[in-house]
Structures are given as structure tokens and as C-alpha cells.
């Protein structure tokens, strides 16, 4: 090792010429360090001295060894390499430190020599294939043991069975991997008597480490258990769960996470191609020289060229956007689908509430609870309302606005409305309750509506002028449906006819009691048979 280091240092020192600028600069530095050196207190006596900078060394003129009329080939003896990793086994091949022979060829001689060597290698390869075919024929594809097949060698294959002259040499690849036995034979033929056996174990460990890439995490990465985090490298995700299986939100690697983004790669590619094509078009349509006067036709052509460049730029942008739209990764699509599914419930709630003419308030209205007791016949709203909120159901016909009061909010001044305050009460008509019968042919049974114990609201019919006036006369007794009717409604109509109050929203279903005491759900729309709704999609709430 010392001899190798010494030879390397000697070569570096030999490269430096004696009369180079490096030696001159050293002499100048040594002379400047002497007692005769000048400083700010002792000005120089001679102004002809101009020291050269050590940073500006002159380039040494070296003889160029590259020649294009001949080929020089250096031949090395084989040694155990310790630098390559074969696909199987050990005994890697290498070269000696110094070459043992040198030979020069012309271009034609080198081409002929290469063809001869390739044909010789091809002849040996065809012999091996012919020998393998004979062994398989004697053993019947390896199913029968044959002593004759075990004794066959390459010398048993004649050259007459192989036609190498009519084979195109350029159609073959000659840098083929060699098996372990062949590598060991080549090393022994080159004079290597002792082959290191420890290299086999090292090569095996390297191959196993190359087969394992990424961490074994699934969706979540624990920094203490993640192999990438322990190694101090980032998690790499080329596609879904490969090579690392962590997700974007669940990766806890302290070094970070890299995800292959095909959209970014495609965008970069399109932008690069666009810039190159625009640059080539600018070079083709260069402006006239400065000494020449620009003619009107030239200016028109230049304007047309700029317009065509702008049009081409817009076309490239459109193609880029189209390509980006079709390059969504699988993980991105799944994430968007999950977001749509999570937001689907809230969207369906908003649409159902809007169809009922309902407004959800964050804070309850200032109405005393004792003035508005609960009703015996609740109204069913098939929507999932958040607990603790207030609901306003505005009237469909508000042709007679009333004067606004001082203490009432602004949204109470537009006309009569129905106010629902969400409270915690047991639901009337729980699933499986006895005594419930089928109300209408167009609606499912009440027990099939899947009504569960959820927050219940109390019905309050209020007016914009006096929200509590309607409830004052009914304190101490249960209000009825006739008490909540406006004055313009006739209460003396027959009970068997459908009742449609003007203050109820058109699509708001309400419940009345028939003569048999069974609850029946009806709607305010006339002459319209509503199909039964799927109870699994919308959960009805009793309010």
C-alpha cells in the first residue's frame, strides 16, 4: 500500500516541470519573505518588480495521445476483481494493476480482428448449444439418466456441424454473463491459485440488499420502525405502494417523502419542447440586418410571424392542459373520490333542506320555551339536521307582509314562518311500535321509515309581528292543528279531504290523526302520488 501511495505521489510530482510557473512563484514567495521584502513603511526601491499571481498558472503543454488513424489495445491479465457484483455466485472478474502487452492496429486491421474474435466466440457458443441439445436428446429432456450424455464434452462436437461463416456476426451480443464455474476456470487459467471465498458471502448480501427497496410500512410510517427513516433517506413512491407503502398523509419519515408525479414530468416535457420549437422558429424568422431599411412587406411578415408564434404558443398550452388532465395518478383519483364521498352527505343535506324551504340557524331564537310546548302530532322532515341548531320554515304565500317589531330579528320581518328548536326528546313512533298501520298506498309504513331515537324539535308557529302571540292563549294545554291555522283558512271543511294550509311549504310533509287514531303522513301537494323513498338513504327525523 505504501509503494502504491508513493508511486502516485511520484507521478504527481513528475508531472510538474522544473521550469514551470509553479517553481517561479515559489521562488518569488520565498524572496518576498526575506528581509528585503517591502511593506507600507518601507516603499520599494525598484518599481520594475511585478509578482505573478499563483492563481493564474500557465497551462502546461502536454502531448496529445489521441490519434484517429490507429487503435492501441492494452491487454491485461485476469484477477479476482472485488469491484463487480455478478448476478449469481462469487469469483468476480477483474484486471491486473498493469497491462502485460500492447498492440497497435489500423482501423481496418482492428475491424478485421474484432470480426475474427467475434466469430471465435460465436463458434464456442454454438458448440455449447449443440452439446446441450445432444445431452437433452440422450436423456429425453432430463427424464432419463444416460452415461453417454455425462461423458460428452465440447471436443465431441465437430466443426462441420456448426456453420459460422454464413452467420451475421452483428446480430449477436458478445458481452454475455458468464456462469460461476466459467469465471473460476478463467481465473485459474490466468494464474490465480487462491480465490477468496469470503467474497461470495459479501456478493450475496449485496444482491439481497438490492432486491429489497423501500420500507415495509403500510399507509403509516413510524419513524422508529421505518427502514427509510432509520437510514436517514426519504421515502420513495413511484406508483401505488411501491417501493414504499406509506401514504401522503400517513408518512412520518423525518427525512421526508418523494412521490413520482407524472403530471409534473409531462408538464416539464411539454414546456421544454414548446420552448425549443419557439426558439427554432425565432431563429428561422430572424429580423433584417441593422444596415438594411425595413420594408413594409418585411414588417408585415414579422407581424405575421409573431402572430403565428402566439397561436402556436396557445396551441401548446391547450395540448399541455389536455395532457395534464389525462395524467391523474391512481392515488390522486382515489383521494378525490374519498373527498367527494365525504362531502356527499352534507351536499344531500343541503339539497333536501333547500327543497323543503328550511333555513338552519347557528343560534336559537329568543322565544320562551314555556310559551311553545311540544305538539302531539309531529311533522316528519326526512333530513339529517345537526343537533343543537334552529330551523326556520318560511311560508310559501307571504303576500301580506306585516309591520316589523323592534325586538324581532330581520329575518322574522318578511312574513309568517314556522320555527323549530332542536331538543333532546324521545321520538314518537319508534320503529316497531304497535298500533301503527299503513297510512297511504304511496308511502311506506311508519315502522319501515327506520325512525330511531334522535333529537326532536318542538313546533312553534310564529308571526313576524308577535312571535309569541299565537302561543299565549294555549299555555297549559296541548295545542291542536286548528289552533295553528291562519284566519283565512276555513276550519269547517270535511275531515276526509286533504288539508293544505297556506302557511306550510309545498314540499313539507306533515302528519295528522285519522278517525282510527293512527298517524298518517301527508303532503301539501295535490293530485301527485309521491313514490316511496328509500329509507336507507334519508333518515327521517321527528320534529
Swiss-Prot record:
Entry's Gene Ontology molecular function annotations: DNA-binding transcription activator activity, RNA polymerase II-specific; DNA-binding transcription factor activity; DNA-binding transcription factor activity, RNA polymerase II-specific; phosphatase binding; sequence-specific DNA binding
Q: Which InterPro entries match?
A: CSRNP_N, Cys/Ser-rich_nuc_prot
Which Cys pairs does UniProt list as disulfide-bonded? none
Q: Where are the transmembrane segments?
A: none
Q: Which UniProt keywords apply?
A: Acetylation, Activator, Apoptosis, DNA-binding, Nucleus, Transcription, Transcription regulation
Regions of biased composition (Low complexity) lie at 31-40
Stretches the record annotates as Disordered: 1-51, 281-305, 488-543
Q: In its UniProt entry, what is this protein called? A: Cysteine/serine-rich nuclear protein 2
Amino acid at each position: 500500500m505504501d509503494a502504491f501511495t508513493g508511486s502516485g505521489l511520484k507521478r504527481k510530482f513528475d508531472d510538474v516541470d522544473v521550469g514551470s510557473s509553479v517553481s517561479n512563484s515559489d521562488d518569488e514567495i520565498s524572496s518576498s519573505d526575506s528581509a528585503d521584502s517591502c511593506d507600507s513603511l518601507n516603499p520599494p526601491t525598484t518599481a520594475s518588480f511585478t509578482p505573478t499571481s499563483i492563481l493564474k498558472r500557465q497551462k502546461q503543454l502536454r502531448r496529445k495521445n489521441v490519434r484517429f488513424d490507429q487503435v492501441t489495445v492494452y491487454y491485461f491479465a485476469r484477477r479476482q476483481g472485488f469491484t463487480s457484483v455478478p448476478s449469481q455466485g462469487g469469483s468476480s472478474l477483474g484486471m491486473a494493476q498493469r497491462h502485460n502487452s500492447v498492440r497497435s492496429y489500423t482501423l481496418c486491421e482492428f475491424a478485421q480482428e474484432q470480426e475474427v474474435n467475434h466469430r471465435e466466440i460465436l463458434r464456442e457458443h454454438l458448440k455449447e448449444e449443440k452439446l446441450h441439445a445432444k445431452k437433452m436428446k440422450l436423456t429425453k429432456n432430463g427424464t432419463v439418466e444416460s452415461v453417454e450424455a455425462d461423458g460428452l464434452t465440447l471436443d465431441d462436437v465437430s466443426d462441420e456441424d456448426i456453420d459460422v461463416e454464413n452467420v451475421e456476426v452483428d446480430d449477436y451480443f458478445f458481452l454475455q454473463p458468464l456462469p460461476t464455474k466459467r469465471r473460476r476456470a478463467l481465473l485459474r487459467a490466468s494464474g490465480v491459485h487462491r480465490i477468496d471465498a469470503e467474497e461470495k458471502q459479501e456478493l450475496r448480501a449485496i444482491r439481497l440488499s438490492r432486491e429489497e427497496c423501500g420500507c415495509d410500512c403500510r399507509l403509516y410510517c413510524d419513524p422508529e420502525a421505518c427502514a427509510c427513516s432509520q437510514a436517514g433517506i426519504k421515502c420513495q413512491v413511484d406508483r401505488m405502494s411501491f417501493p414504499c407503502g406509506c401514504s401522503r398523509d400517513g408518512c412520518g419519515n423525518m427525512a421526508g417523502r418523494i412521490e413520482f408525479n407524472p403530471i409534473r414530468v409531462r408538464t416539464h416535457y411539454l414546456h421544454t419542447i414548446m420552448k425549443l420549437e419557439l426558439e427554432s422558429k425565432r431563429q428561422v424568422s430572424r429580423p433584417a440586418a441593422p444596415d438594411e431599411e425595413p420594408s413594409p412587406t418585411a414588417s408585415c411578415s414579422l407581424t405575421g410571424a409573431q402572430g403565428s408564434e402566439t397561436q402556436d404558443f396557445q396551441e401548446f398550452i391547450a395540448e399541455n392542459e389536455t395532457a395534464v388532465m389525462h395524467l391523474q395518478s391512481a392515488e390522486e383519483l382515489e383521494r378525490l373520490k374519498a373527498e367527494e364521498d365525504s362531502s356527499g352527505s352534507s351536499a344531500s343535506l343541503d339539497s333536501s333542506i333547500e327543497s323543503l324551504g328550511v333555513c338552519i340557524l347557528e343560534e336559537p331564537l329568543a322565544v320562551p320555551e314555556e310559551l311553545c310546548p311540544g305538539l302531539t302530532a309531529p311533522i316528519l322532515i326526512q333530513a339529517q339536521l345537526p343537533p343543537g341548531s334552529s330551523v326556520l320554515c318560511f311560508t310559501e304565500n307571504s303576500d301580506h307582509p306585516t309591520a316589523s317589531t323592534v325586538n324581532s330579528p330581520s329575518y322574522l320581518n318578511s312574513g309568517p314562518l314556522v320555527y323549530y328548536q332542536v331538543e333532546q326528546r324521545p321520538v314518537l313512533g319508534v320503529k316497531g311500535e304497535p298500533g301503527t298501520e299503513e297510512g297511504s298506498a304511496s308511502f311506506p309504513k311508519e315502522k319501515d321509515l327506520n325512525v330511531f331515537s334522535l333529537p326532536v324539535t318542538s313546533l312553534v308557529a310564529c308571526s313576524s309581528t308577535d312571535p309569541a302571540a299565537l302561543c299565549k292563549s294555549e299555555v297549559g294545554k296541548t295545542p291542536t292543528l286548528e289552533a295553528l291555522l291562519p284566519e283565512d283558512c276555513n276550519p269547517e271543511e270535511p275531515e276526509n279531504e286533504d288539508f293544505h294550509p297556506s302557511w306550510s311549504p309545498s314540499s313539507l310533509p306533515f302528519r295528522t290523526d285519522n278517525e282510527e287514531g293512527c298517524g298518517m303522513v301527508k303532503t301539501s301537494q295535490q293530485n301527485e302520488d309521491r313514490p316511496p323513498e328509500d329509507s336507507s338513504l334519508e333518515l327521517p327525523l321527528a320534529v
